[in-house]
Amino acid sequence: MAGFVIRPYRETDRAAVIAAEIDLQEYERTLHDTRLPGAAVMGAYFDRLQQEVAAQSGAILIAEDGGRFLGLVACIVEADDEVQETADSNVHGYITDIYVVPDRRGSGLAQALLRAAEDHLAPTGVSRVRINVLAANAMARRAYEKHGFEPYEVMYEKRLARRR
């Protein structure tokens, strides 16, 4: 897919990124009841994301075409201290966010953003990249599997009845 560039985030992208994060949050609210209204939380969420990116060898990358915002991907290097896991599992790349505008979904842009995140993470020395997805988000799961991601851990949830 031609006609777009992927470049580092600039502060002038903030409004478009927050709007994208709100759109993503509102979509995820249709998939699971744990998601709060996007407009209420995404400004603070993005502030925290920027801090994590700065502290953890990360990047926020923007896809655009002629100045039109098309999407974003954010990634960090995450370090865990799980004594039962290998070193390359404990220090891994993590894609925190990915978003593509609705009229470009299915065009290959998500794949290009994922590659760009991998290109950013590779020089850090990580050999694994992870991404989380809501179980009900079949479209995202297909995109990640198409890109070569495989299920790693599966988390189950059960609601408990209120007890007195």
Predicted feature descriptions by range:
Residues 1-15, 164:
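Conserved N-terminal entry element of GNAT/NAT acetyltransferase domains
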